[in-house]
């Protein structure tokens, strides 16, 4: 093991000393990630400055490739990163989240020897120096590995495999509460979730949602709360079979990685994207990082797997193949809190009351697999009350591990008060009380003693 460490360290030192000979100016260093984030109009201006021909006929990825190639010819140094996809032949490519991990001309080639040397696997986020393609080559190639999963490459070789890590119940709270600083603020969704179904790092949560109940907006609010209150968490929003305009809206409103496969793309593409995202998350958890994946929707992902999986000859009610749900269950089941550091949280939406028997079967299969459930109610949404959360049917298992005992007792008192009410009256009652306070702590302070609270807050 020590010999391997020595070899890896020597390899890194050698490549670093080689780089010292490349005395490039700061403005000659091109960051591939920053280049991919630019708008097509900005790339066209940069291409014109480099005197690249036929700019208007090039797609964005082709434009990035042309700019990189021209910059290298003029003495530039390229630094790039991406998520590794290892192909059956042994070599791999770094795919970019900016293009939803689609294969493209600007992908970075990694040789089988580099993959073996650093113990790389599909899903690893690799960063390093790259070179332009030589004569007869089609892709940029990785010259030097600087970091693996935002960590030293040597550590990647000795990490414990995800499947060998010990899963535990979530015991560290994932703060979702956003303070209401003004009386005009009407969004109390994350505060309601904190009261009825608190989330922890490593939670496997299901948002059960009929159509038009505000599930996408709820996910946006959760994403915003996570990035605001938990900056150490790596957030990925996975949109499967969604409308393109909703993808754009999510990208503009969420400060995190948003990847998508829209409804006009084939089922195989939905599956490939989901596999890349879950593998990336697993690799980060192996490095003791906290990852949160928001999935919209798990039902559509299960439909995609049902289309892609080879037919077993056994078909369940609604046209679901008997083997089709095994892989989406493995995706959802990957969420866990890890002993000695690291966690993977998955919050996914499950569609119900769509009129499709298949969706009902998928939901029934996933029901009970999560350890937290938020149920949205169509009747509440029809009254234009948001969030349309059915408080009595929503909850978290082992919530005593996440919440202070005094607060937990007050949460139970609140449930006893709300229980006799209908779902609409319950959420209206709670929202009215939350409007008068900035935080949930203030709300609990307003509550009377448990004995007197049974008659109302």
From Swiss-Prot:
Which EC numbers characterise this protein's activity in its record? 3.6.4.-
Q: Which InterPro entries match?
A: AAA+_ATPase, ATPase_F1/V1/A1_a/bsu_nucl-bd, CSD, NA-bd_OB-fold, P-loop_NTPase, Rho-like_N, Rho_factor_ATP-bd, Rho_N_sf
List keywords of the entry alphabetically.
ATP-binding, Helicase, Hydrolase, Nucleotide-binding, RNA-binding, Transcription, Transcription regulation, Transcription termination
User: Region labeled Disordered — which residues?
Assistant: 1-23
Tagged with keyword ATP-binding: yes
Per the record, what is one GO cellular component? cytosol
Residues given in the record as ATP binding sites: 200-205, 212-217, 243
SMART domains from the xrefs? Answer: AAA, CSP, Rho_N
Highest taxon, organism lineage? Bacteria
Q: For this protein, what is any one GO molecular function term? A: ATP hydrolysis activity
Q: Which GO terms describe its biological process?
A: DNA-templated transcription termination
- Residues crossing the lipid bilayer are none
Function statement? Facilitates transcription termination by a mechanism that involves Rho binding to the nascent RNA, activation of Rho's RNA-dependent ATPase activity, and release of the mRNA from the DNA template.
Q: Which family does it belong to?
A: Belongs to the Rho family.
* Subunit-structure text: Homohexamer. The homohexamer assembles into an open ring structure.
Q: What is this protein called?
A: Transcription termination factor Rho
Please tell me the species this chain comes from: Rickettsia typhi (strain ATCC VR-144 / Wilmington)
**Gene that this sequence comes from:** rho
């Amino acid at each position: 093991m020590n010999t391997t460490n020595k070899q890896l360290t020597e390899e890194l030192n050698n490549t670093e000393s080689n780089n010292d000979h490349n005395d490039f100016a700061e403005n000659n260093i091109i960051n591939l990630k920053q280049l991919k984030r630019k708008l097509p109009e900005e790339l066209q201006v940069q291409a014109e400055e480099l005197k690249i021909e036929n700019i208007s006929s090039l797609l964005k990825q082709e434009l990035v490739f042309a700019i990189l190639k021209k910059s290298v010819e003029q003495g530039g140094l390229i630094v790039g990163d991406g998520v590794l996809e290892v192909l059956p032949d042994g070599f791999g490519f770094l795919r970019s989240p900016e293009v939803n991990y689609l294969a493209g001309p600007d992908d970075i080639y990694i040789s089988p020897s580099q993959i073996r040397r650093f113990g790389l696997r599909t899903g690893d986020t690799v960063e390093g120096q790259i070179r332009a393609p030589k004569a007869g080559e089609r892709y940029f190639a990785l010259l030097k590995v600087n970091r693996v999963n935002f960590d030293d490459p040597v550590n990647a070789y000795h990490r414990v495999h995800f499947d060998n890590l010990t899963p535990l119940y979530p015991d560290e709270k994932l703060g979702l509460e956003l303070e209401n600083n003004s009386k005009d603020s009407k969004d109390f969704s994350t505060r309601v979730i904190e009261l009825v179904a608190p989330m922890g790092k490593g939670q496997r949560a299901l948002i059960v949602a009929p159509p038009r109940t505000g599930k996408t907006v709820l996910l946006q609010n959760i994403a915003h709360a996570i990035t605001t209150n938990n900056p150490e968490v790596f957030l990925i929003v996975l949109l499967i079979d969604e409308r393109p305009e909703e993808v754009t809206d999510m990208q503009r409103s969420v400060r995190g990685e948003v990847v998508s496969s829209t409804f006009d793309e084939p089922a195989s593409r939905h599956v490939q994207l989901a596999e890349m995202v879950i593998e990336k998350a697993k690799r980060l958890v192996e490095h003791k990082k906290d990852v949160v994946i928001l999935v919209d929707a798990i039902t559509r992902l299960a439909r995609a797997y049902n289309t892609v999986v080879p037919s077993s000859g056994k078909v369940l009610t609604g046209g679901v193949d008997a083997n089709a749900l095994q892989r989406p269950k493995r995706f959802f089941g990957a969420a866990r809190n890890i002993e000695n550091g690291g966690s993977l949280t998955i919050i996914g939406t499950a569609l119900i009351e769509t009129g499709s028997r298949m969706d009902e079967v998928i939901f029934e299969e996933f029901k009970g697999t999560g350890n937290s459930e938020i149920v949205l109610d169509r009747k509440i949404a029809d009254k234009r009350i948001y969030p349309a959360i059915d408080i009595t049917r929503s909850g978290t298992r082992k919530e005593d591990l996440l919440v202070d005992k005094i607060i937990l007792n007050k949460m139970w008192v609140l449930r006893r008060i709300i229980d006799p009410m209908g779902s609409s009256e319950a959420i209206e009652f709670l929202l009215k009380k939350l409007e008068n306070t900035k935080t949930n702590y203030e709300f609990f302070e307003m509550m009377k003693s448990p004995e007197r609270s049974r008659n109302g807050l």
